[in-house]
Amino acid sequence: MVMKTRSANNKGKRLQNNIRDLILEKFQQLEEDDVRSTTMGDSGEDVLLSPAARRLFPFAVECKNQEKLNIWSSLEQTETNAGKHIPLLVFKRNRSKTYAVLEFGKLLELLDEDSESTQ
């Protein structure tokens, strides 16, 4: 059965809203309008961050809630929309966990920065 466009958009919007809520839950010093889910069909990042939010969460988020994800085209879209920020692809499918993907080298850089700040 093929999913209608409206249903697919609602499914994607639910993931965007969930990611927005998780970021706000993790960084409780942020205000609700520091992290916003974009309108479906808008170009650019799926979760918009204020400068205050960006300092805590330096990622450009692209959300995909699809049963069959083309990982390579999704990563390309994520990188295109990221601009100067760190591209982060967040994805899930029905009844699955939510996963996040970023370039491995960038992950190592972030871990290195984190270890330097804790020394």
Positions of the model-derived regions?
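Catalytic phosphate/metal-binding cores of nucleic-acid and nucleotide-processing enzymes, i.e., regions
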Residues: M1-Q119
